[in-house]
Amino acid sequence: GFRDGSADRISHGF
């Protein structure tokens, strides 16, 4: 969500 902006929820851009 924050770093990358992919299929995440809070702060996981994976």
From Swiss-Prot:
Signal peptide: none annotated. InterPro entries: Tetradecapep. Keywords: Amidation, Neuropeptide. GO terms for molecular function: neuropeptide hormone activity. One of its GO terms (cellular component) is extracellular region. GO terms for biological process: neuropeptide signaling pathway. The modification Phenylalanine amide is found at residue 14. It comes from the Eukaryota. To insects allatotropin. Has a stimulative effect on the contraction of gut muscles. This is Myoactive tetradecapeptide. It comes from Amynthas vittatus (Earthworm).
